[in-house]
Amino acid sequence: MKPILTMLVGVAGSGKSTVAKQIAQKSGAHIHSSDAIRAEIYGDENCQKNPGRVFDILLQRVCRDLRDGYDVIYDATNLNCKRRMGFLKSIAHIDCEKRCIVVITTPEDIEERMKLRERKVPMEVVHKQLCQFQCPNYYEGWDRIDIDQNSKPEDCRASYEKLWRECDIYHDNHHHTLSVVGHMMCAADKAVDFAWDAKTDLVQNRWVARIHDIGKPRCKVFVDRDGNPSEEAHYPGHQGYGAYYSLIFDCEDWDIPERISIDNACLIQWHMEHYLRDPYSLSKFYKMIGPELLKRLTILEKADKAAH
């Protein structure tokens, strides 16, 4: 039987290390943590210098254990799609099963857990990670992806509803005449029309459009891309924050198939790409995500623009 590589994905304080230990206890898998390696070579797991050296050591140990037939757990935040794909390419020469577990915890629970941790990560750092969050998908090269909901369903519901209420704010940006919640509701209606024309799922396309900007209240700043004060509001990272919250909402209590939850999160995190990439990069990106997801992303992009 092939060894199993399990990569954990999640922000600080989400419970990744606990999940890693639970898996290791059942399977005997070897855990490799970037925090542990930093503590080993620098004497401080918070030390962020020379991350390349930390990664090289971790990769070397992961490859060694997989070649020796051991199951391996890679415990780090692993929030970035490009870096995850790069890691999978680095172990492509080893015949193993590639699994990914996304650990999702409400920010409220994370804040409470931080109070009990010996090693505390500031919530400002957690917020930055939420904005950087990119949900894994099978186009990255995984054999299996699981969502590990680390908060209770009732806490997920409360956290989602709290953020939804926060969306009743003006955009304060010339691209939008509607409030954030008004824009999303309008986009949801537009998405139904575009999905009907494309002969594809109405319910899920409407749902994604209805929450695609839900991260905006937590990301609103009056600072431009260059860090200069701005009279208009900007929303850096709202797509990542929103993607994360789509998975908070899509907990087991809501009975939404996991594969659909993953695709929905990816649509939210990628809905700004056509503004952020040059034509060549955008073409490569569209090829990466594949025709089915691109079809749904196009519907979301059109609905988003039509609801401005």
Where do the PLM segments sit?
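Short hydrophobic/aromatic beta-strand immediately N-terminal to the Walker A/P-loop
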Residues: 5-7
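Conserved GTP-binding G-domain of TRAFAC-class P-loop NTPases and closely related GTPase folds
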Residues: 9, 108-159
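Conserved glycine(s) of the Walker
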Residues: 15
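Conserved substrate/cofactor phosphate-moiety recognition/catalytic segment
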Residues: 18-70
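Glycine-rich phosphate-binding loop used to anchor ATP phosphates in small-molecule kinases
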Residues: 50-96
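Conserved phosphate-donor/acceptor-positioning beta-strand/loop module used by diverse small-molecule
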Residues: 94-113
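Active-site flanking loop/helix segments enriched in acidic
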Residues: 160-188, 221-232
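Divalent metal-dependent catalytic cores for phosphoryl transfer on phosphate-bearing substrates
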Residues: 192-307
